[in-house]
A protein has these predicted regions:
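Short linear sequence motif anchored by a di-proline
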Residues: 1-209
Length: 209
């Protein structure tokens, strides 16, 4: 999977009510192992005591796409997605809202079914017709280089038509849903982990027919 965020940091920050600060993002695609804008309402680093008497602001900061795997999995690649919400590796981060974050995007790519012309698999870029810049649900882990992983859920009809079983969790286009993910209890936040309506998605296949 890849995704794109075709908007500069300042514009994304305004759209999500987040302080962009010195984020250098100017727009483009994001691949695993690259830094990308992340919107969080928690601390930048969890080590140390929580600041007393101060409300933490929603802000956008660069973080690495990919979380170091558990120590019990030697020589494994970084983990890019969260699929098992009950996994001991993830449950603490999911229940603690400080570790939940939003990943802004304008489209994401999955490999689709082979082209009828040449039999080669095509890139399928999925966008949301009802929100030009959307938020994908994610969590981050506090490590030497803090990284994030996207939450995955069952694929909707548009993704299943291309042979996919899962898709990233896309939040509805309203501030209330984003607030629940960033601040709410896990019982409320977990209810957002569901497929986005395929009727609200557009797909572009490359190369085109």
């Amino acid at each position: 999977m890849l995704y794109r965020l075709d908007a500069a940091a300042a514009a994304v920050g305004r759209a999500f009510g987040a302080r962009a600060g010195d984020d250098p993002w100017a727009g483009g695609h994001v691949a695993p192992g690259q830094f990308a804008p992340v919107i969080t309402a928690g601390r930048e680093f969890i080590a140390g005591p929580r600041p007393a008497g101060r409300t933490l602001e929603t802000r956008m900061i660069p973080r690495l796409w990919g979380v170091p795997p558990p120590p019990s999995v030697p020589d494994a690649r970084p983990v890019l997605t969260v699929r098992n919400l009950q996994s001991p590796f993830w449950i603490g981060n999911l229940r603690n809202s400080e570790f939940r974050c939003l990943i802004p995007a304008t489209a994401f790519m999955e490999w689709g079914k082979p082209s009828p012309k040449d039999g080669k698999r095509r890139q399928c870029w999925f966008a949301c017709a009802d929100q030009p810049v959307f938020a994908m649900a994610a969590v981050w882990k506090d490590s030497e280089v803090p990284g994030f992983a996207l939450l995955a859920c069952e694929a909707n009809a548009a993704l299943r038509a291309e042979g996919r079983d899962t898709m990233p969790v896309i939040l509805p286009p309203d501030a209330a849903a984003r607030d629940v993910w960033l601040h709410g209890g896990w019982d409320r936040a977990q209810a957002l982990v569901q497929p986005y309506s395929s009727s609200l998605m557009a797909v572009r296949r490359l190369p085109e027919d």
